[in-house]
Amino acid sequence: MTILNEIIEYKKTLLERKYYDKKLEILQDNGNVKRRKLIDSLNYDRTLSVIAEIKSKSPSVPQLPQRDLVQQVKDYQKYGANAISILTDEKYFGGSFERLNQLSKITSLPVLCKDFIIDKIQIDVAKRAGASIILLIVNILSDDQLKELYSYAINHNLEVLVEVHTIRELERAHQINPKIIGVNNRDLKRFETDVLHTNKLLKFKKSNCCYISESGIHTKEDVEKIVDSNIDGLLVGEALMKTNDLSQFLPSLKLKKNLYDS
């Protein structure tokens, strides 16, 4: 069984145990905060938008530096992040909906709930906890599930980041006409990363959609390798959690976009 399959089985177990129902009962409702739309930054900013991630660990990185997460979010906003991503998976990524609930209150930026969503109730919990964006991973959803969950989120005034890794997944994503697609440079089955993977998939980009490069971005040089693919933004976690000079590092990633679309 791959790590991804293991994670999905775990999510199904949580659904059976009414884990998400309990979260809806105990979380403070923070779902109606007015925030700028991520799509506006992606469409109108002349530099790459950065979704800055709060991350404690992952299957590929067992432990990241301990940070004051409240200060980390404030610094992300201070140094130019366009959105905040907060992992809510407890077992594999060390996150929680309580963390999302707490941190979403201290920022006016768009907030992404980063999780493995397979059911509508997870979207309900994400919104209640304070998310304004949810992640849908094409690899773990059927076409019907993808369409249903996407529509459900949009109808609940959430933005959706639709994540793909292969050309086939990109084709499936394009069928629902999303506004934002994320190209994951990490193979979720093997957890191997290649930042140049973005360039391969962006050859098939459509003009009515914005594209974000996710995973494997550790340096300004990594961004320079992919900026000419006409990406609109980046999702960066590990490198931002590790750096001791956030004031210099985060702005250095916001390269000027290649505005000459092919």
UniProtKB/Swiss-Prot annotation:
GO BP annotation list: L-tryptophan biosynthetic process
Domain of life per record: Bacteria
Annotated transmembrane regions: none
Catalyzed reaction equations: 1-(2-carboxyphenylamino)-1-deoxy-D-ribulose 5-phosphate + H(+) = (1S,2R)-1-C-(indol-3-yl)glycerol 3-phosphate + CO2 + H2O
Keyword ATP-binding: no
Keywords noted in UniProt: Amino-acid biosynthesis, Aromatic amino acid biosynthesis, Decarboxylase, Lyase, Tryptophan biosynthesis
Pathway where it operates: Amino-acid biosynthesis; L-tryptophan biosynthesis; L-tryptophan from chorismate: step 4/5
A Pfam entry, by short name: IGPS
EC number: 4.1.1.48
Any one Gene Ontology molecular-function term assigned to this protein's record: indole-3-glycerol-phosphate synthase activity
InterPro entries given in the database record: Aldolase_TIM (IPR013785), Indole-3-glycerol_P_synth (IPR045186), Indole-3-glycerol_P_synth_dom (IPR013798), Indole-3-GlycerolPSynthase_CS (IPR001468), RibuloseP-bd_barrel (IPR011060)
PANTHER family noted in UniProt: INDOLE-3-GLYCEROL-PHOSPHATE SYNTHASE (PTHR22854:SF2), TRYPTOPHAN BIOSYNTHESIS PROTEIN (PTHR22854)
Family: Belongs to the TrpC family.
NCBIfam families: PRK00278.1-3
Name of the protein in question: Indole-3-glycerol phosphate synthase
Lineage: Bacteria, Bacillati, Bacillota, Bacilli, Bacillales
GN (gene name): trpC
